[in-house]
């Protein structure tokens, strides 16, 4: 092997550079463009042209010696297009990009492809997922696909248009030439039409279709500020079947599908909310003359505060409508989170339909959305004009705070306000509501108590309340089509959504849980705050993930949240935690899924703090009166006398007809005597124990035994044993059949069991806390523990020590 040296490495680099320069000479580019290319750009362009040559070399040759058109004529047609042509594989590798791209994006073809050989290198990163979904969506090869994305533009063009350019792409896949590479990477050919803010006027009466109609099905229209049709192109006859004269001076809303009225009105409001040259997009259904419905993708442009509104209308299929509407909803939601301005925030939450819904010309209303058949014809609803409906969310609506929603009416008929008249399957903007901030399908309202001045003194000025729903990315909801709440706004569903928020009790107003959605910057005006009264006894338990709609809720839930403020209005205004963002980005925080109670219900709050191993505090919670203390001492003496009497065996009469067995035990056998030593088999020491006095729960008069039954017990126990005294006589003779006493002949296992049994605490001792706190008496009343030092001749113990 040859050893590498410095000279040999330099020779190899020179050889590689020479080959790259040879590739540059082979590129079909102008000399001015070749001079500006670097080695990396040359290699990227070489890959693109190589793929292009291989693909077109395997295609079918054109009919005739030169085809239908010459090469120059083809170049002239491509240059005259109101867009540019783009060819790339399913994995995004570029094959061709027309030279006319420089007129629309500001970059020349060489500049764009020099950035990389993939389409993802020349489009906005936010649209990578959209393009990837379109390229991987299964369909027939000859099926057209329509989607929109933003292309990167030059710095000079970005300064003029304030961002990347939005482009509408329509194309299809082609049959691949033979080869393993092309079998897995079909080629997609697309025509890209930039969505110009000012469409190019066409010849003839009315707004002309322009050259774009040669590649994109479209018609143009011009409207007044209320969207009344001022003019429309003649090509509307092809797509809707109406003559131009039939539509002039008519309201554009008269052609809309009822389920798309809310979507169109919200976009119309956005277009009128700001002055200047802005645009709005919508995907709606327009009624054709034959009675059917046609999906239309509309681009609306405003020519200033006094000028008309111009619209480009693109007929699309059901699948394209579903894809575009889903993309619009996603972009509007992201813009609402990041910008937080009224011009960008959608004024209602738009539903995203599936492709199965789009295949049906009439969508099924979503959950909680009133159907057209269920609208009550109440006189108080009336007919609301478009101007009145748009005037309700006025420009004074400021998203630096979250207003308190109005109290709903008790019936569904009263709940359907003016804004809900025309909204299946969407919910229009409600003044004071902000459910659209959290991507919900409908805003709910709940019965909430009026503000309280007592809580205003406890809560900080930046604390307000709102009853809107904050839905985590992990929360699941039942199918709206199978739910029993279909087509209705019910109070139970509203409260079930509200219960998923993390509440705070008013017992500790200065301790707020970190799972509440809070917003950092100070409020613009403290007058917008609305507070909720405290809740004296509150106990909240979060539902499990499977129980999305709980059946029973707390009777009067009161929850406190924080206000939305400023640009980064989704940050927590709590002390920082490991999960809190700190880089200043606008991020939506998901709610913490807690699986336990958020508060502990203390029935009687003691005066001192409940701390582990606390020192004894003032004994003011439980106190015995003098009478109760005397009764306790008397009961202790009676129990001790009863225990002393148990040292003597029961008589036959006492065992059968005297005391009844305690706790369901069977009476003692009169033929069985407990012979042996007087003291018990096991010497057990009494343990000191504490217990919480429960005299406040039970009637004190029923706690003690009457004197007469106790005296009867003592008289029965004092009856002499007919069989003699303890320990007298032969055990064999006393017990019939020669049965030994169970107290003398115990197996080691029985002794071990008795020892374990003696060490167990009673049920009452086990339920009592071992930590002293206020409410426990530090005076312990118990039996005196003293070992018997003398016994009588009969085997009984000494005199009672009480």
Swiss-Prot record:
The gene is Npas4. Efficient DNA binding requires dimerization with another bHLH protein. Heterodimer; forms a heterodimer with ARNT, ARNT2 or BMAL1. Residues 70-144, 203-275 form the PAS domain. Residues 5-38, 624-648 form a coiled coil. Transcription factor expressed in neurons of the brain that regulates the excitatory-inhibitory balance within neural circuits and is required for contextual memory in the hippocampus. Plays a key role in the structural and functional plasticity of neurons. This is Neuronal PAS domain-containing protein 4. It is found in: Nucleus. PANTHER family: HYPOXIA-INDUCIBLE FACTOR 1 ALPHA, NEURONAL PAS DOMAIN-CONTAINING PROTEIN 4. Residues 14-53 are annotated as: Helix-loop-helix motif. Residues 472-495, 502-518, 527-555 have a biased composition (Polar residues).
